[in-house]
């Protein structure tokens, strides 16, 4: 497993060098004050350099070497890293629909709207979004791809082959193609890229709709052998959309079934809770707010406490109380089984979509 050497820039300008198997998770620990004592109280913190090493031992040796650098040498290292990354920053988005638009918004926040170009089958839709965000609209898909380092394909799976055949003449070495289509593997996508001038990097991202408000859960995977700069570049571009996590491609369909489809499973639950509130006497608007805020808070408890959801449930259920009575009613009606079956059904459909 790869390890990383990273440099954090603290709010007061201090540069902190460290190692981690997962830089984003380590950064989160620093931000919570659970990282090194040298970064506590010195926020905001930003990763300004990262370097991949083959193992932990190599990372520790590289960390020791960097720590011996003078500040000017560290700054030169950071500057070189930033310059290499900036050469790959311009992003094109093919498709401006419900899933494409949140990613476009994220990229505009990450690198500036001037570094983003969009194209859409219905040009008026692309123009409306561009007017809102300040990004450019390309004449067509190929023109968008030709001017970008990252080309995001935000189209439905059944449209992907046709879109790629149109883009192939504009794609080549030094570019990264990023698909958000469910079910379509890197192997399938690579086959449709035959004829490109060179070999663009190939990655997949699976977002969800909360990305529109910066609360998304996104998965990222890539074809074997993809350079780290492309993976890190996509992470940087999409970071404003929410949490971006690297996973194995074999887990993408399962991830999509849980996190991609999951919001549509939760919304009816919130609506049903609100309906229950109305039934027992709450005004509709208040019931909806209470239900939604409760789900938001419960999710935060799971993420921030580190406790198992079952433990958190037990902490609310007192013997003979109203909460355990409600939990029992859910169990009697197959609530848990229905949720599992929903994920399984979505997973099977994702696999069907990949059979092209």
Regions found by a protein language model. Give the residues of each.
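Rossmann-like NAD(P)(H) cofactor-binding subdomain of soluble oxidoreductases
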Residues: 103, 123, 133, 141-220
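NAD(P)-dependent Rossmann-like dehydrogenase/reductase catalytic/cofactor-binding core
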Residues: 292-356
């Amino acid at each position: 497993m790869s390890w990383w050497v990273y440099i954090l820039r603290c709010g007061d300008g201090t540069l902190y060098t460290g190692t981690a198997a997962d830089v984003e998770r380590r950064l989160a620990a620093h931000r919570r004050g659970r990282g090194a004592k040298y970064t506590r109280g010195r926020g905001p913190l930003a990763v300004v350099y990262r370097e991949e090493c083959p193992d932990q031992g190599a990372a520790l040796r590289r960390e020791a070497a960097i720590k011996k650098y003078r500040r000017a040498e560290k700054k030169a290292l950071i500057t070189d890293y930033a310059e290499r990354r900036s050469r790959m920053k311009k992003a094109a988005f093919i498709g401006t629909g419900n899933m494409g638009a949140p990613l476009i918004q994220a990229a505009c926040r990450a690198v500036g709207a001037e570094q983003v170009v969009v194209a859409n089958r219905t040009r008026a839709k692309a123009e409306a979004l561009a007017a809102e965000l300040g990004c450019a609209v390309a004449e067509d898909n190929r023109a968008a791809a030709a001017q970008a380092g990252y080309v995001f394909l935000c189209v439905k799976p059944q449209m992907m082959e046709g879109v790629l055949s149109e883009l192939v003449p504009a794609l080549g070495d030094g570019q990264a193609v990023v698909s958000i289509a469910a079910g379509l593997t890197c192997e399938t996508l690579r086959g449709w890229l035959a004829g490109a001038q060179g070999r663009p990097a190939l990655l997949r991202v699976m977002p969800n709709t909360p990305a529109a408000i910066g609360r998304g859960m996104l998965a990222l995977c890539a074809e074997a052998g993809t350079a780290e700069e492309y993976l890190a570049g996509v992470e940087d571009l999409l970071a404003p959309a929410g949490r971006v996590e690297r996973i194995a491609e074999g887990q993408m369909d399962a991830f999509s079934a849980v996190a991609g489809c999951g919001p549509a499973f939760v919304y009816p639950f919130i609506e049903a809770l609100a309906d229950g509130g109305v039934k027992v006497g709450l005004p509709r608007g208040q019931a909806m707010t209470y239900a939604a805020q409760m789900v938001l808070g419960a999710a935060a408890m799971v993420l921030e406490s580190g406790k198992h959801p079952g433990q958190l449930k037990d902490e609310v259920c007192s013997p003979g109380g109203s909460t355990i009575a409600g939990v029992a009613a859910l169990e009697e009606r197959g609530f848990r089984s229905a949720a599992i079956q929903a994920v399984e059904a979505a997973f099977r459909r994702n696999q069907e979509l990949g059979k092209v």
